[in-house]
């Protein structure tokens, strides 16, 4: 690869990596490869583990941390997640605070590849939740939140913590 991004170091795929430390080692191998081969690394500057495990001259950072190249402020308004950058408010229909870094990483890659803000927003607009990821299913007067694809302890905890913060 020429560009690499790790959204986070979650407790997924533990069985294949021999534990959480193995997940960190395995995911960090991509950073090592990119550093050795002059690739570009997009880092979540709000994730201390990523900052500790990746040191490269070609790293670009994103996050709420003001030291990031791509800085975003997280806002909930009009039943949407909004990421405000220096020059644009990106809107997404995806629910859940835990999706902030997913959306911010997507926007950052678009900016890194010189897409315009409107082109990036168009991509966010056409994205549809499916495949058991961040889906909201209306069943009569009830809402079902379906976020079970490849569920793991980290993803389940994040999904449950958002029930009391629902804005949709």
Specify the residue positions occupied by each region the protein language model found:
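Active-site beta-alpha connecting loops in nucleotide-dependent enzymes
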Residues: 129-132, 148-168
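Acidic, Mg2+-coordinating active-site environments of NTP-dependent enzymes
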Residues: 2-143, 165-166
